[in-house]
Curated annotation (Swiss-Prot):
GO biological process: proteolysis involved in protein catabolic process
Naturally occurring in which organism (per UniProt): Desulforamulus reducens (strain ATCC BAA-1160 / DSM 100696 / MI-1) (Desulfotomaculum reducens)
Protein name in the entry: ATP-dependent protease subunit HslV
Gene3D superfamilies, per database record: Glutamine Phosphoribosylpyrophosphate, subunit 1, domain 1
Top-tier EC class: hydrolase
EC number: 3.4.25.2
Cellular location(s): Cytoplasm
A GO MF label: threonine-type endopeptidase activity
Main location: cytoplasm
Length: 176
């Protein structure tokens, strides 16, 4: 459904990292940008967020999510649930084509375009066209190594870029 990106996140204990590639693809066959930043710090650096999907839609969701974070004083779960409610019920928001991964030291969540809030069981998740590849790599590295979340997300995204034509190796990793 969503092309032109991969976002992967890993949470181990109180350490969490979110990584994204830099490729922006126009249509099915033209790379428009190699160095986009799809992972950001929010709420005074206490929350990480990454997006897959339409760039304009994702920026709208970032703005809405950041507003909810402020409204609920940094409570990630509450902000995510309230954004999901708005996403499901608001006529304009329902048309947005994007997904978000948001995380802090306590929670790692996926916010989908259907207004779902999903907290992965194993502290590992990925979205975007290269998401399945990055997810498989991150799960294996989490299970069989002692690498940090930062290193796991970097290596998982690097592997996804070897497989997915919509993902490049211009990797940005944010960690808290």
């Amino acid at each position: 459904m969503f092309h032109a990106t991969t976002i992967v996140a890993v949470k181990r204990g109180t350490k969490v990292a979110v990584a994204g590639d830099g490729q922006v693809t126009f249509g099915q066959n033209t790379i428009m940008k190699h160095t986009a930043r799809k992972v950001r710090r929010l709420h005074n650096g206490q929350v990480l967020a990454g997006f897959a999907g339409s760039v304009a839609d994702a920026f709208t969701l970032f703005e809405k999510f950041e507003g909810k974070l402020e409204e609920y004083h940094g409570n990630l779960m509450r902000a995510a649930v309230e954004l999901a409610k708005a996403w499901r019920t608001d006529k304009y928001l329902r048309t947005l084509e994007a997904m978000l991964i948001v995380a802090n030291q306590e929670h790692l969540l996926v916010l989908s375009g259907n207004g779902e809030v999903i907290e992965p069981d194993e502290g590992v998740t990925a979205i975007g066209s290269g998401g399945p590849y990055a997810l498989a790599a991150a799960r294996a590295l989490t299970k069989h190594t002692n690498l940090s979340p930062k290193d796991i997300t970097y290596e998982a995204l690097n592997l996804a870029a070897d497989i997915c034509v919509y993902t490049n190796k211009n990797i940005v990793v944010e960690e808290i």
